[in-house]
Amino acid sequence: MKRILSCFVFLWGGLTLAAQEIYEFTVTNADGKSVAMSNYRGKVLLIVNTATRCGFTPQYKELEALYEQYAAQGLEILDFPCNQFGQQAPGTAAEIRQFCSANFDVRFPQFDKIDVNGPTAAPLFTYLKEQKGFAGFDLKEKAGQLLDSMLRKQD
């Protein structure tokens, strides 16, 4: 009984270790290195899943322009290629990064190719999909001020 109880406590403890906020995740960049999401604490994050062989691929140019304009103010665009939608992100992470660099001069962080749906979905994207929708931002915070300035320019 003591052994079973110990096992239960261990498993229960493991459940409490599940990420409760985005900064508890670790992801893999396009170079295959682990990156702690806590590195981005205090930044405004735009996390995108992308494909390099679809009708929306030219949006990389717009994402890069957004990054260039607001990176100094704390914007980080985190690009996670995904091949789950019509096999439109072929190649390795390194090949995808090379394509984006050569065609769109992308300089924002790019990460390993992942799945965003199903049983093989990356834990970060599973977490993101479980979150509530946008509820506004606090203009007293740097992130809120940046978002406010970006959205006002687009109105």
Language-model features, listed with the residues they occupy:
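Sec-dependent N-terminal signal peptides
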Residues: I4-G13
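N-terminal "domain-start" segment that seeds a small globular fold
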Residues: L17-S38
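Amphipathic alpha-helical repeat scaffolds
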Residues: N29, N49-R53
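Conserved helix-turn-beta segment immediately C-terminal to the redox Cys motif
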Residues: S38-V44, T52-R53, T57-P81, C100-F104
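Extracytoplasmic/secreted proteins, especially bacterial periplasmic and envelope-associated proteins
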Residues: P58, E62-A65, G91, E95, ...
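Thiol-based oxidoreductase modules, predominantly thioredoxin-like and allied folds used
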Residues: G74-G91, R107-G118
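Thiol/selenol-based redox catalytic cores and closely related redox-interacting motifs
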Residues: S101, D105-D155
